[in-house]
């Protein structure tokens, strides 16, 4: 179901065990604190992993370290989360309302669906929302998905 070369995000406001089990036979990692998660991923035998709200409580620098480690270990991921900010780090996004698939597509396509995301209670990631607002004032003519890139553009 999931391509081993693509990182996915599943936005779901209340995934239960049945939902997670339907995803497939990919190993699920959940409820690990940062150091234990790093330790587990360093010797992870599989090429794919499912995070079930695992990244939600991590600080941004910890998430970046996890993503760097995953890339180094050549492990792709499916991140099941209720945090729309985590969608920024995925290539492909599925958005669910209960057990109903509402949106699906690459990151740019899904994050353009502002009204639908807000209706479902997600809103937009901060950097995306800010860059859209700056577009209204003709400061930019594109949407940014990376805060560092947005800051560099503001300084130029």
In which residue ranges do the predicted regions lie?
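Conserved H-loop
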Residues: 74-82
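Conserved catalytic segment of ABC-fold P-loop ATPases
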Residues: 88-95
């Amino acid at each position: 179901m999931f391509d081993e070369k693509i990182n996915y995000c599943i936005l779901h406001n209340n995934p239960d065990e049945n939902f997670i089990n339907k995803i497939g036979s990919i190993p699920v990692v959940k409820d690990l604190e940062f150091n234990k998660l790093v330790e587990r991923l360093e010797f992870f035998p599989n090429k794919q992993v499912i995070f079930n709200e695992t990244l939600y409580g991590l600080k941004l620098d910890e998430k970046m370290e996890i993503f760097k480690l995953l890339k180094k270990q050549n492990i792709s991921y499916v991140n099941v989360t209720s945090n729309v900010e985590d969608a920024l780090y995925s290539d492909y996004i599925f958005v669910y309302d209960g057990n109903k698939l509402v949106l699906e597509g690459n990151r740019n396509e899904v994050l353009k669906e502002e009204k639908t995301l807000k209706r479902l209670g997600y809103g937009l990631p901060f950097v995306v929302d800010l860059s859209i607002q700056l577009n209204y004032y003709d400061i930019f003519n594109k949407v940014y998905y990376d805060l560092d890139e947005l800051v560099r553009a503001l300084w130029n």
